[in-house]
């Protein structure tokens, strides 16, 4: 098993303490990625055969292996904290005390109820205290938690808590606007609706002016 970074461990512990960690079996089953892919491919073969698909066809023959590789290496890679991004946090020597906002962060996740796509954008803001973070690291944290089976409400809060933990401040805000393909492509088949979730901490929750400044940046993206 890969050794986790200190940052990954701290974030995981913070989410567990708040009841916000993604539901995982306990104890975690130890298995290397190749073995995991092999088992997933075997189960996908059975599913496709039950759907009466011909896996002898050259278009379908490698699909179980492709899906297994995609699940482990890409769309669900955020289930493994060994993949948590390397975080660069530096001392706030400039004494920045105004809002830092990153808008239009693209994200693609997977609805944990139907295993179909959630496609959206995030806006993340924080007010620095003793530390500032490399801006691209915010995008990577969003991508990490998006790379799991998710519900949007939990995803929003996970990003918030991760940044609060890494930055040592409660002054963090996250908003996500997303289209859920479990609504768009099945069931009611509503192709135009979107879902917005917001999680606010510190001054973003207690100060009306700070909250409104953040929400204006969300509306104007």
From Swiss-Prot:
Q: Which GO terms describe its cellular component?
A: cytoplasm
Q: What is its EC number?
A: 3.5.4.16
Q: List the GO molecular function terms.
A: GTP binding; GTP cyclohydrolase I activity; zinc ion binding
Where, in this chain's numbering, is Zn(2+) bound? Answer: 111, 114, 182
Please indicate if the UniProt record lists RNA-binding as a keyword. no
Q: Would the keyword Translocase be found if you checked this record's keyword annotation?
A: no
Give the superkingdom in one word.
Bacteria
Q: In which pathway does it act?
A: Cofactor biosynthesis; 7,8-dihydroneopterin triphosphate biosynthesis; 7,8-dihydroneopterin triphosphate from GTP: step 1/1
Q: Which reaction(s) are listed as its catalytic activity?
A: GTP + H2O = 7,8-dihydroneopterin 3'-triphosphate + formate + H(+)
Q: Name one GO biological process term.
A: tetrahydrofolate biosynthetic process
Q: Which UniProt keywords apply?
A: GTP-binding, Hydrolase, Metal-binding, Nucleotide-binding, One-carbon metabolism, Zinc
Assembly: Homomer.
Regarding protein family, the annotation reads: Belongs to the GTP cyclohydrolase I family.
Q: Which PANTHER family match?
A: GTP CYCLOHYDROLASE 1 (PTHR11109:SF7), GTP CYCLOHYDROLASE I (PTHR11109)
Recorded protein name is GTP cyclohydrolase 1
Give the originating organism.
Erwinia tasmaniensis (strain DSM 17950 / CFBP 7177 / CIP 109463 / NCPPB 4357 / Et1/99)
